[in-house]
Swiss-Prot record:
It catalyses: tRNA(Arg) + L-arginine + ATP = L-arginyl-tRNA(Arg) + AMP + diphosphate. This is Arginine--tRNA ligase. GO terms for molecular function: arginine-tRNA ligase activity; ATP binding. GO terms for cellular component: cytoplasm. Monomer. Its main location: cytoplasm. The gene is argS. Pfam families: Arg_tRNA_synt_N, DALR_1, tRNA-synt_1d. Disulfide bonds: none annotated. The keyword Cytoplasm applies. It comes from Oenococcus oeni (strain ATCC BAA-331 / PSU-1).
Length: 566
């Protein structure tokens, strides 16, 4: 039952249908203090039309409105406050939750495709904590988009091309030990990459050697291509192990190399439209009227040596994806520092006459640090993501052993809790904020953590198991505790929360909702004896089951498991 819509309709009827229904619906609020009503309607915006004080308009609406579905409607100053008939509402809400697997989902995106560029680790380097944010934010946004009816295409735009591969090959040829590399491929390749970067600070010939090997790779030299393919193969194998643990999958793994033969057509297209200008031997696109001066109003398409730039490759990929997928939106889940780059790309596409560039969005996010330090492969201070997941699993196992020493499948649950802690911690803050990682804190079963929400779900499932009942809703809800009403109100907000999370491309909205629902339930559990065999138990168990269902559904939106026992 959509009370926001019902209230807007009833108000419009009272006002003789003189207002736009959608505009009225957007004005309906949910008061933070439930004593002021379950919903409230501010009348300030109606004052100009009726030439009356908002307080008078509120009184008129409260006196004349149809009160069906409401226990009470009253004016408080300029607000009209609505109090729902709680038993009837709760009964209908829980039926919607428990009898439909897709509660909260909608079809607003039916028939539309969303392309999501996410994760994008570099070949021959381990997946580090630096890749976590793009990966889990992209996965969560994909799940949220699907909950809003869209079809998603997740693309892992692998960093599998560039001069760094020339350096990697040069380092391998100089210092590579096949025995060590075969034993631990990516770690050894990283050591070689760090070493050649350090050595090249004093030996400039190493950079020249790297450039020469990359030129061989571009020209299809068999040895260079063989080594490049090997670097890629061992990297993808390690990446997949991490993705499996995070529950992340992709529809395309087309990386930078895929677009090697697609960039020259882009250059020719820009030239044919008179958009290219020569500047000191380089070819540029001038964007003075589309971007402010501090946003790089000149985009270099080709360097003076003929080499293409990242933006050339991104233009090629954007055009290819538009032609291949006919997307409604194309999202790039990339760090906030890349905003100017994507502004440039969109501006060039619009200059070229591609109005669909407006459907491209940069989904930026803040930096991630470990103990206040940024991570860099060149300097060697990287934190492999697999190590973080291993440590999180171990810390979760210790928590589980302490709280539930006899738990079956404890290792499996520890993996779910550890990985869930890492993912939830990343997603619970506004994605534009930077986050610092503290593993000891994020695996705790208390506080604003993923394990706290998971533990709440497990606790609620335990209550249902102890009740010995399966088909709980068969008699309906006949009673609603005063202390339970915040839970009911929170559950009813789930569908709108899913819409808002998609509108803002913001997974933290889901995470914050789940924390609030978990706190509401735990407060209720602390003050209410649920498993008491009386006329109230059935209604209370139905509520518990509703909480279980929504917690599990919400965690799934974030890519976090919901263990039944912890």
């Amino acid at each position: 039952m959509n009370f926001t819509h019902i209230i807007a309709e009833k108000i419009n009827q009272t006002l003789e249908n003189t207002f736009d229904l959608d505009k009225l619906e957007k004005l309906v609020e949910k008061p933070k203090d439930l004593n002021r009503g379950d919903y409230a309607f501010p009348t300030f915006s109606l004052s100009a039309k009726f030439h009356e004080a908002p307080q008078k308009i509120a009184l008129k609406i409260a006196d004349e409105i149809d009160r069906t579905n409401f226990a009470n409607v009253k004016a408080v100053g300029p607000y009209v406050n609505f109090f729902i008939q709680r038993v009837e509402f709760t009964n209908q809400l829980l039926k919607e939750i428990l009898l439909n697997d897709d509660f909260g989902r909608n079809n607003q995106g039916a028939g539309k495709k969303i392309v999501i560029d996410m994760s994008s680790p570099n070949i021959a380097k381990p997946m580090s904590m630096g890749h976590l944010r793009s990966t889990v934010i992209g996965e969560a946004i994909s799940k949220i988009a699907k909950a809003n009816g869209y079809q998603t295409i997740k693309i892992n735009f692998l960093g599998d091309w560039g001069t760094q591969f020339g350096l990697m090959i040069a380092a391998y040829k100089l210092w590579g030990d096949d025995k060590l590399i075969n034993k631990n491929p990516v770690d050894e390749l990283v050591k070689l990459y760090v070493k050649i970067n350090k050595e090249s600070e004093t030996d400039k010939s190493l950079k020249d050697s790297g450039r020469a090997w990359f030129k061989k790779l571009e020209d299809g030299d068999p040895e260079a291509v063989k080594l490049w393919n090997w670097f890629k193969s061992v990297s993808l194998k390690e990446f997949q192990e991490v993705y499996d643990r995070l529950g992340v999958s992709f529809d395309s793994m087309n990386g930078e190399a895929f677009y090697n033969d697609k960039m020259e057509p882009v250059v020719k297209m820009l030239a044919s439209k008179g958009l290219l200008t020569e500047s000191q031997g380089a070819e540029i696109v001038d964007l003075p009227n589309l971007l402010p001066k501090d946003n790089y109003p000149i985009a270099m398409i080709k360097r003076s040596d003929g080499a293409t730039q990242y933006i050339t490759r991104d233009l090629a990929s954007a055009i290819y994806r538009h032609d291949a997928y006919d997307f409604a939106k194309s999202l790039y889940v990339v760090g906030a520092e890349q905003k100017d780059h994507f502004d440039q790309m969109k501006a060039i596409l619009k200059l070229a006459g591609d109005d669909w560039a407006d459907d491209i969005e940069h989904i930026g996010f803040g930096m991630i640090t470990m103990n206040g330090k940024k991570m860099s492969t060149r300097k060697g201070n990287i934190v492999p993501l697999v190590d973080v997941l291993d440590t999180a699993r171990q810390l979760a196992a210790e928590q589980i052993s302490e709280k539930n020493p006899g738990l079956e499948n404890a290792d499996h649950v520890a993996e779910e809790v550890g990985a869930g802690a890492v993912v939830f911690n990343d997603l619970q803050k506004d994605r534009n904020l930077s986050i610092d990682f503290n593993l000891e804190k994020i695996v705790q079963f208390e506080g604003d953590t993923g394990p706290y929400v998971q533990y709440t779900h497990a606790r609620a499932m335990s209550i249902l198991r102890k009740s010995g009942q399966q088909a709980i809703l068969n008699t309906g809800v006949t009673f609603v505790d005063e202390e339970a009403w915040p839970i009911v109100s929170r559950l009813s907000a789930y569908p709108e929360m899913i819409k808002r999370a998609w509108q803002l491309r913001e997974p933290s909205i889901v995470a914050k909702y789940l924390l609030s629902l978990a706190r509401d339930f735990n407060s209720y559990y602390a003050h209410t004896k649920i498993l008491v065999n009386n006329e109230k138990m059935q209604s209370r168990l139905s509520l518990v089951q509703g909480v279980c269902s929504v917690l599990k559904s919400g965690l799934n939106l974030l890519g976090v498991s919901a263990p039944n026992q912890m």
